[in-house]
Structure formats: C-alpha cells, structure tokens
C-alpha cells in the first residue's frame, strides 16, 4: 500500500495537507491562519476566539435541518519530538510520512496524528457535498498538549451545539464517556543546614530502573514509586537509629509521571555504616519481591560520598515522616457499573527537589468526582501541614462525570453495533481530557470521545493504524445520520 491508496481518501488528503503546516504546542499561529482561511474560502461561518480556538459552522444538508446540532472537536497542536540525529525545524518544516504495512508513521519525528487525524476528519466533513448531516460546528482547540490552554480559555457561548464528539481518542472500539479532574498539591519545607560532628560517614543511595508511567492512566497498574520507597527506607532507619542525618533527597521530574528513580544522601555515625548498608540490601530484596511482577529491573546502589552540611534534624524527620504517611496510589474505585472497576480517585507523589534551604514537593491528585478530588487534595495537604510544611493545591482542571441518561452514548453505541456487529467498550479514563473543561462551561452538553488506533504517541515511533481510520469515519458518518430532531 502506498499513500495514494489510503482510505478514506478524503480524510488522508486533509491529513497530508495538515502535516505541511507547522503546529507545535503554544506556537500554532500558522495552523490557526490556515483553518481560518480554509473556512472562509469554503464560504463557511468561521470565527477565531481570543485564545486562538477556531470554529467553522456548516449548515445542515437538505432534509436534515431540524436535527440537533453536533459539535465535532479536535486539538490543532502536536507534540514535536524527533530522533537525536534527525534534522528538522518544527517551526517551519513539514512532517514527512510513509506507510509501513497497515500503519502510517513519520520519518524520524512524531506523526502528529494526535490530533491531526481528528482535525482531518472535521475538514473532510466540512468539504463534503454528499454526506448527510444536521447542523455541525467543527471546533479546533489550541495547546491541548501542554496545558489544555484552548479549552481552558474558551468562553461559554463559543459553541452552541447539543452534542459534542471529541475525536482525540487512541483506541478504535473504545468510546470514552468520562474523565478525571486533576490538581497539583505542592509542599515546601524550609530549613537551615548544619555541620555534623566528627566521626560521621556520608552515604549516597540511589534507586533506578523502575517502570514509572503516567500517573493517571497507569496508576491502576500499581507500579512502584521511587519517592515512596526511598521515604519508606529513611523512615525505618531514622526511627531505628537516632544518629541518621539527611542531606539531600531528589526524585522525579514531571508532575504527571510516576517517578522512576531517585536518590538521597545521609550522614551516619561511623559505627552504624555497616548496619545501614545491611538494612539497605535487605530492604531492596523485600521490595523487589513485593514488585516482582510490575518492576523487574530495579537497581539499588549505596556508596560513600563527600561530606556536606545536613538539613536541620527536626525538619528532616518531619519531612521523612510525611513521606511515610502521605497517601499514594489508588484511593477509590468508580461505583458506576458501566465503568467496570475503573480508578475513580488517586494521588501520586511526583517529584522532590532539595536546594540549599528548601525541599519542594509536587504531587498530583485525580478524580472523576469533584468532591472526592477536593477531599483527596485536602488529605495530602493536611499530611504536609501536620509535618510543618507550607502546602497548597492549585486550581487544576475539572472532571467529566459520566452521564447516565446520555442520548449520544445510546446513538453511538447502537451505530457501532449496527456497523461492526459487536458492542464497543464504553469507558472512562483516569486522566484529563478537554471534555472535562467543556463540561464545566457547558453543563448540559452531551459528549463522547472516540478515534482511530494510535500507538507510541508523543514519540518518534508514533503510528496510526490505517484500517481503523476508515472504521471511525464510517462510524462518525452513521452517527451523524442518526442524530435526533430538535
């Protein structure tokens, strides 16, 4: 198969044009101008809001004028990543694609099918003159990937439809009907550094090789968290031996990832050195046994290191006590039977950075129920406040709660069964989607999310499964035919 043979041709033609346009997150100006010019050149009602979101409205086809209005929504930006030795200027150069069996992928870069393929479906529908549909609003949001900026900045009234279909999902056959809201809770311990008496020995411990993963979508896998493990060891040693002093603790890099590695530096009386090493080895063996399924490549090291001032003892102990006490992982499971045991509420301690006089901690909380998100954040904040830290939770983003009487879910499900002879998986996701922000501003909007199969998104290995594009296109058109009257 070559690119000229890709089906549906109308969608892949639009996707090829989109991939000529640079559209890195936060630098989507060329894409905004392209969409604006495209809509106007096709004689369609086209508007750009102050955030940079674009909406293109198309009237109903003949005989469909009394159907409810459907919003189709995708994000226009893409994650720009490349192989180390591949030359590209993402602000000016096109994405070069090729067919690899049943997959479309890119030469040395991310493909941009997340969410360029959703945008392509919208443009193909807008350009058509032979597809039955009621009134439609095609919405293209900006900067989804690095902050949900477009959805966050969209004001009520920009969209006016009754139903919304988000085209940003990555597994054909799965229909998303709910997503988690999320917030970051940060904590800060302030301290003075002191010198240790003569006779102390400094040791640097490191843990690496954990699997990690996304702190929302992967939290149900119950993988090891480097911060919690290192904190657990320190708690055991500092409550067992009076003389252990903490100098450094660093772990994690991203607010939305399970930390894969970490390190600490401690000072111990010389006569405790061998005891600490023995405890470290026993602890490593125990933890490897606990996580023998999820994390099989752990690497534990402990070695001598240079002397340095330590954190004042009471602050260090309060910090370690808080690490031991703070909730981490799954907190509650969804009660809706349709969501099939999905995680509802969770917390992940994500990163810790120690500087000369501060320890800064970032954690993330998620829930599909906003009151439980409030409670989870309060629990994390209270843990650190009790330990003497300054702690606060940010504004975050709202949940999209499953709608039990959804007309759109029923239409989408029945259409899928009619076309493919099997039921789709109706599910939620324990991560944030733009639908969460839409649900806050448009509380009566009935929404679903679906899309073709993508793999290795956000990496140069990103690939789009070609046969599923036709399936999603057929499904989308059948849904539009069956939208009810006003």
Residue positions per predicted region:
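Acidic, glycine-rich active-site loops and adjacent beta-strand->loop/helix elements
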Residues: 76-78, 139-147, 169-172, 211, ...
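Acidic/His- and Gly-rich active-site-bordering loop/insert found
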Residues: 2-102
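Zn-dependent metallopeptidase/amidohydrolase metal-coordination segment
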Residues: 7-11, 344-357, 420-478
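His/Asp/Glu-rich mid-to-C-terminal helical/loop segments that flank catalytic regions of hydrolases
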Residues: 36, 157, 223-240, 270-273, ...
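Active-site metal-coordination/substrate-binding segment of hydrolases
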Residues: 64-146, 151-162, 184, 202, ...
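Midchain, well-structured core segments that form catalytic/ion-binding scaffolds
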Residues: 102-105, 145-146, 152, 156-366
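Substrate-recognition/cap regions that form aromatic- and gly/pro-loop-enriched pockets
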Residues: 342-431
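Active-site-adjacent substrate-binding region
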Residues: 225-227, 232-249, 402-445
């Amino acid at each position: 198969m070559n690119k000229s043979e890709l089906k549906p041709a109308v969608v892949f033609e639009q996707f090829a044009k989109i991939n000529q346009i640079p559209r890195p997150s936060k630098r989507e100006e060329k894409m905004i101008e392209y969409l604006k010019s495209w809509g106007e050149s096709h004689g369609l009602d086209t508007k750009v809001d102050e955030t940079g979101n674009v909406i293109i409205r198309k009237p109903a086809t003949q005989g469909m004028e009394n159907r409810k209005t459907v919003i189709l929504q995708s994000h226009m930006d893409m994650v720009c990543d490349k192989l180390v030795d591949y030359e590209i200027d993402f602000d000016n150069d096109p994405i070069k694609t090729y067919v690899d069996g049943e997959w479309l992928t890119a030469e040395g870069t991310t493909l941009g099918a997340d969410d360029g393929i959703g945008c392509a479906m919208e443009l193909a529908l807008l350009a058509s003159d032979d597809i039955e549909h009621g009134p439609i609003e095609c919405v293209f949001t900006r900067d989804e990937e690095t902050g949900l900026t477009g959805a966050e900045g969209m004001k009520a009234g920009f969209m006016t439809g009754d139903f919304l279909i988000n085209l940003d999902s990555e597994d054909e056959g799965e229909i998303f009907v709910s997503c988690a809201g999320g917030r970051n809770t940060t904590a800060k311990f302030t301290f003075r550094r002191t010198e240790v008496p003569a006779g102390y020995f400094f040791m640097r411990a490191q843990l690496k090789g954990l699997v990690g993963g996304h702190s929302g979508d992967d939290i149900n896998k119950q993988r090891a968290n480097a911060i919690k493990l290192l904190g657990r060891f320190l708690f055991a040693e500092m409550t067992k031996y009076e003389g252990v002093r903490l100098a450094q603790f660093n772990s994690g890099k991203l607010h939305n990832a399970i930390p894969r590695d970490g390190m600490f530096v401690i000072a111990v009386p010389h006569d405790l050195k061998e005891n600490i090493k023995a405890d470290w080895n026993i602890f490593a063996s125990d933890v490897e046994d606990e996580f023998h399924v999820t994390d099989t490549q752990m690497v534990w090291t402990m070695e001598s290191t240079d002397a340095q001032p330590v954190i004042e003892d009471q602050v260090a102990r309060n910090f370690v006590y808080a690490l031991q006490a703070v909730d981490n992982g799954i907190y509650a499971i969804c009660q809706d039977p349709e969501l099939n045991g999905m995680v509802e509420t969770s917390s992940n301690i994500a990163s810790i950075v120690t500087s000369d006089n501060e320890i800064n901690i970032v954690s993330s909380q998620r829930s599909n129920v906003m009151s439980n998100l409030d409670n989870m954040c309060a629990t994390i904040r209270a843990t650190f406040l009790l330990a003497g830290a300054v702690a606060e939770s940010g504004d975050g983003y709202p949940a999209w709660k499953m709608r039990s009487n959804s007309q759109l879910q029923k239409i989408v499900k029945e259409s899928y069964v009619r076309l493919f002879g099997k039921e789709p998986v109706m599910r939620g996701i324990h991560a944030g989607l733009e639908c969460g922000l839409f649900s806050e501003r448009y509380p009566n909007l009935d929404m679903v999310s679906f899309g073709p199969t993508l793999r290795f998104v956000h990496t140069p290995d990103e690939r789009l499964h070609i046969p599923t594009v036709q399936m999603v296109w057929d499904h989308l058109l059948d849904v539009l035919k069956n939208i009810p009257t006003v």
